[in-house]
Structures are given as C-alpha cells and as structure tokens.
Design a protein with these regions (language model features):
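NAD(P)H-binding glycine-rich loop region in Rossmannoid oxidoreductase-like domains
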Residues: 33-73, 86
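NAD(P)-dependent short-chain dehydrogenase/reductase
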Residues: 129-180, 186-187, 193
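Substrate-binding strand-loop-helix patch
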Residues: 150-152, 178-187, 206-224, 277
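Rossmann-fold cofactor-recognition segment
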Residues: 21-37
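N-terminal Rossmann-fold NAD(P) dinucleotide-binding loop
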Residues: 3-4
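Mid/C-terminal beta-alpha module of Rossmann-like enzyme folds, strongest
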Residues: 191, 198-245, 286-294
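Catalytic helix-loop patch of NAD(P)-dependent Rossmann-fold dehydrogenases
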Residues: 72, 76-80, 100-141, 145-147, ...
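Amphipathic terminal alpha-helices
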Residues: 261, 270-301
C-alpha cells in the first residue's frame, strides 16, 4: 500500500533501495527490521541519504494474537532503524498512527497526549516515543485510515467493501460509531517528500482533510462506483462485529494537521477528493469484472 506509493514518488527523483520480508514486487529486496545485524548490513552497504521506515504489523487482531511479533516489528524495528539513522547521521522517517489515541476527544492535534488501547497502538506508540526521544534527525508522521494500492494491494476498508461487492453482496453492514480521516497514500508520499525538503524535523499529524465515519466512507465509495441503487448499506454499531474484530478501537481517530498547516507544509487533500481519485482504479477494474447479482454480507475495516 504505502510502500508502493513511496517507491513511485521517490524512485522518479532518486536511487531507492526498497526492502521487505514479503518480496511481492521485482523492485523489492529482503530485509527484516527485527534483525538489527541483518538490516544494518542491508542499509550501510547502500549508503542512504534518508531512511524511511514503513515496516509495520497493522492488523489489530493479528497483533493481539501475536503480541511478541507486534512489539518486535512495530517497536523494536523502529528502534533498530533509528539507531542506524543516528549512526549514519541521516534523517529518519517513522510512520505512526491515529490509533495511539484513546478516542475520548472528537479530534486530536499534534500536541495531544496519546492513550493507546490495543497492542497494535501500544507497540506503535512505543516506537514513536523512541524515535522522538532518541533519534536526532527524525520525522514522525501520524497517519489515519490508509487507502491506497488498489484492488491488488489494498488490505484496508475501501477494498474490503469492494471485495464484498465482487463476491455478489447486495447488502453491506457498516459501523457508524467510528470516526476518523482517510489517509491517501499518494498524498502521504508527497507529504514525506515535502517534509524532507523542509528539514523541519519533528512530529506531524498527516491525514486527509475533513472528518467522517466508516459508514460515510462506504456511502461515498458506493456513490462513486455508481452503485447507489444496487447496493444497500445498513448502519450497525461496533458490537455487530465484536467477535471478528475484537481488538479495542477508539471511537474517534480524527487527527488535525495543525503543525503542517502552521508551517505551510500540508499537501493532503480533502478525503472526498482523495476517495474520488482513488476510486478510478476500482471503476476501471469493475468494468472488466462481474458485479453483484444478489446476496447479503457484513463489512467493516
């Protein structure tokens, strides 16, 4: 998702070494952020001008089931790359999350105090704290509900909705009690580049403009697909999915890009504009796909 957008943005202007433990693209090499010695060797042989850490275990239920791996990937991995960035004296970009907040406020600025609820959020917050406290040249960017990668790579809410439609579902159940802001990966990658050019290190919220519920995202996506008369979306509470999605989630993950706005560095568009742009790839895919006949299903991200 985000890795592809960042690679496309930076490979057009610089030499990029992109790594992962899942080599699903020809431009990827292998590196495991949990293994300090291995990732140190991988990075130092390349002599980078900047290190961008996109490695994360983001499935909340997976993090609850495998808490050790969550901490090793999201916290220790962040530390390993941060130590290497200090050693090489290069800027370090760490991606944090709106999930680190407890949901007791309607919206959070860069200066609000986190209160993580889930193992995922706690491990990401731990990584964020280390980077902010120990890495000299750091950018910590807090993202919201990621959308990007299209039908092939998007593992988040928008593609979950689309996949249900492809499966022939005509009735979708979507929660209306979770609020936040989508984060379009294309704009997010542009934002990373803008910040690196600025050399204004620090912590930044970086999400799309506006606020919405999961339900509102689903309604807008269905409208953009031209399926308003074909798909029925039913509002449900989070309890509807309590067995499948059992990890604690804050009621509100809405972030405000206060610092980016104050410094004239905000490149993030309104969430509806981003969803419209992002939906083009799904519309193109649907033209070659068999869209639904009848069914009923439940959806949440």
């Amino acid at each position: 998702m985000l890795g592809e957008a960042v690679y496309q943005k930076f490979s057009s202007i610089a030499q990029v070494k992109a790594t992962d433990i899942d080599l699903n693209e020809p431009w990827l090499g292998y590196a495991d952020v949990r293994d300090y010695a291995q990732v140190l060797n991988s990075i130092t042989e390349f002599h980078p001008d900047v290190i961008i850490n996109l490695a994360a275990l983001t499935d909340l239920e997976c993090c609850e089931r495998d808490q050790e791996n969550s901490w090793l990937t999201n916290a220790l991995g962040a530390e390993n790359l941060g130590l290497i960035a200090n050693q090489l004296d290069v800027p370090y970009v760490y991606i944090s999350t709106a999930s680190i907040f407890g949901g007791d406020k309607e919206a959070y600025t860069d200066f609000d105090e986190p209160n993580p609820l889930s193992c995922y959020a706690k491990s990401k917050h731990s990584g964020e704290l280390f980077v902010r406290q120990c890495v000299r040249k750091h950018y910590v960017l807090r993202a919201g509900w990621m959308m990007g990668g299209g039908v092939k790579k998007d593992k988040k809410f928008v593609n979950k909705i689309y996949r249900q439609i492809l499966d022939g579902k005509r009735e979708l159940h979507v929660v209306d009690d979770k609020f936040g802001a989508p984060t379009y990966t294309v704009d997010f990658a542009r934002g990373i580049h803008r910040l690196l050019e600025s050399e204004l290190y620090g912590l930044y919220n970086q999400v799309c403009g506006g606020s919405c519920s999961r339900f509102e995202v689903a309604v807008e996506f269905i409208r953009l697909l031209g399926l308003e008369g074909e798909i029925e979306i039913r509002k449900v509470s989070s309890d509807f999915f309590k067995n499948e999605y059992f990890a604690p989630r804050p009621a509100s993950e809405r972030l405000v890009n206060m610092k980016l706005n104050a410094r004239g560095l905000n490149v993030m568009q309104d969430w509806k504009s981003c969803l419209k742009e992002y939906s083009v790839s799904f519309i193109q895919h649907s033209q070659g796909a068999s869209l639904p006949a009848e069914a009923a299903e439940e959806s949440r991200g």
